[in-house]
Every structure is written in structure tokens, then in C-alpha cells.
């Protein structure tokens, strides 16, 4: 959402996804934010600054340095402002992550094993890379998918669907109950299973 605010206000991409220093990127966001009044991002940002950092001002280009310094100081010294602390203070009960079918879900396993974590973190199955045969890297991805299910290669459509089914089952064991799809287009052509 922050990137959208920045892009819609003409901020050069090098300050959004580029390699400019974090402080400069924050400055550009702060300068763009006042143009988002009425957009939830404007209100969320200022509400978060108030609730978590005790800042009663409004973030803009003129206050960016003050906010940057305040937030960085509090993040370094306030034990309530750890990732877990922020999640717990926000009364978050469930976090869904977006995960690729070949992911090992290592951190999901670690979180599940930690009895001190009181909220649920579950993976979501996002098989985009297994869908579009025209995307660069598709063949390499299929080789990785084959390897993760213990196969040398996936030589037929049934092999691919079986591999994806195995990964869905693994994800389900790890708490997955949702999938997430980012399709560039929806290919459709009537075909029989044999075709």
C-alpha cells in the first residue's frame, strides 16, 4: 500500500523498490503521505505512530526526520516493540503467510513448536510458478517441484498434479487452509482429461 501511495504521487521507483538508503526512502514516503488524505493508508500510518510510538503529530515531509529518529530509538530500546510484542499488542489471532509449493515451511514448524506463541501463523498455498508455462524459469521450477516430492522429473500432467497434491497435503499438515493465486491471465480451453 505504501508503494502505491508513493507511485501515485510520482516518487521515482529508485526510492520505492530501488537501492536508495532507507532514510531517503522514508522521506519520500512521508512527503507523499499527505496526498493520501481520505485513503486508509494515511489514517493507518498516523494511528500506528500514535498507538505504538506515542507520536501525536502527523507524518509529512517536514516531520519525517523527527518521526524517523523517534521510531528508531523506540524500536531499539522498548521491549514491547519487538515483532512479537507488536503482534500481541495488536490482538492479532491469526497470520496467514504466502508460500510457494516448494517451500519447506521451516519457520512455520518452528512457530508451531513454540508454546509461548499465542497466535496462529499458517501458510497459504501460492502455486503461481507452477501455472504459467510461458513464464521464464518454468522448466527450472518444475525440476525443483519434482525434487521436493522425491521425483527425478515431472513428465506428464498427472505427474504435476500429483506433485502439487502432495505439496497441498504437506501444507495442510502445517495448518494451511487457504490458497492465494496471482494469475496474469486465466487460460481456458475446453479439453478432456486425456487431452
Predicted region positions:
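Metal-cofactor-binding active-site regions of metalloenzymes
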Residues: 1-195
Amino acid at each position: 500500500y505504501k508503494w502505491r501511495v508513493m507511485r501515485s504521487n510520482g516518487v521515482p521507483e529508485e526510492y520505492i523498490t530501488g537501492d536508495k538508503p532507507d532514510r531517503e526512502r522514508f522521506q519520500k514516503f512521508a512527503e507523499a503521505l499527505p496526498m493520501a488524505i481520505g485513503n486508509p493508508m494515511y489514517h493507518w500510518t498516523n494511528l500506528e505512530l500514535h498507538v505504538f510510538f506515542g507520536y501525536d503529530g502527523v507524518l509529512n515531509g517536514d516531520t519525517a526526520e523527527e518521526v524517523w529518529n523517534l521510531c528508531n530509538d523506540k524500536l531499539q530500546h522498548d521491549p514491547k516493540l519487538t515483532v512479537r510484542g507488536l503482534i500481541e499488542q495488536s490482538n492479532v489471532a491469526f497470520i496467514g503467510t504466502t508460500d510457494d509449493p516448494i517451500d519447506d515451511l521451516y519457520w512455520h514448524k518452528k512457530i508451531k513448536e513454540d508454546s509461548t506463541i499465542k497466535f496462529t501463523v499458517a501458510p497459504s498455498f501460492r502455486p503461481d510458478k507452477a501455472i504459467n508455462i510461458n513464464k521464464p524459469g518454468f522448466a527450472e521450477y518444475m525440476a525443483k517441484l519434482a525434487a521436493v516430492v522425491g521425483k527425478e522429473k515431472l513428465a506428464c500432467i498427472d505427474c504435476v498434479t500429483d506433485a502439487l497434491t502432495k505439496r497441498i497435503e504437506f501444507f495442510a499438515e502445517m495448518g494451511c487452509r487457504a490458497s492465494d493465486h496471482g494469475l496474469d491471465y486465466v487460460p481456458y480451453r475446453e479439453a478432456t482429461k486425456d487431452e
